Amino acid sequence: MPRPTGKKFDKRRQQQNPLFKRKKFCRFTAANVDHIDYKDLETLKDFIGENGKITPARLTGTKSHYQRQLDTAIKRARFLALVPYTDQHKA
C-alpha cells in the first residue's frame, strides 16, 4: 500500500511542533566556558526539567563535551544537597 502524499499529509507535517523550530546552540561554547562548576546553581537549574531529570543534549543543543561536564556537575550538586533530586516533594 503506498504512503499518503496528498495535501492533507503535508499540512499535518508542517503543523507538528512549531516550538522546536529555533536553531539550537551550545551556551557554553558561545560563552567560552572551560569548566562547568557545580556551585553555579542558576546555570544548572536551566538544564533540569520539571520533574528533576537532566534535559538531554538533543533538546538543549549542548555539545557532548559540555553535556558530560553538566551531568557530573548536576550529580555533584544533588549529592551535596544544593539541588533537589526531584521537584515533586509535598510540603
From Swiss-Prot:
Q: Does the keyword RNA-binding feature in the UniProt annotation?
A: yes
Pfam families, per the entry: Ribosomal_S18
Please give the subunit comment from the record.
Answer: Part of the 30S ribosomal subunit. Forms a tight heterodimer with protein bS6.
Please state which protein family the record places this protein in.
Belongs to the bacterial ribosomal protein bS18 family.
Provide the alphabetized UniProt keywords: Ribonucleoprotein, Ribosomal protein, RNA-binding, rRNA-binding
Which organism is the protein's source? Paraburkholderia phytofirmans (strain DSM 17436 / LMG 22146 / PsJN)
Name the UniProt record assigns to this protein: Small ribosomal subunit protein bS18
Signal sequence region: none
Query: What is the primary gene name for this protein?
Result: rpsR
NCBIfam families assigned: S18
Top-rank lineage group of the source organism: Bacteria
The UniProt entry's GO CC annotations, sorted and at most eight, read: cytosolic small ribosomal subunit
Q: Does the keyword Ribonucleoprotein apply?
A: yes
User: What lineage does the source organism belong to?
Assistant: Bacteria, Pseudomonadati, Pseudomonadota, Betaproteobacteria, Burkholderiales
Q: Name one GO biological process term.
A: translation
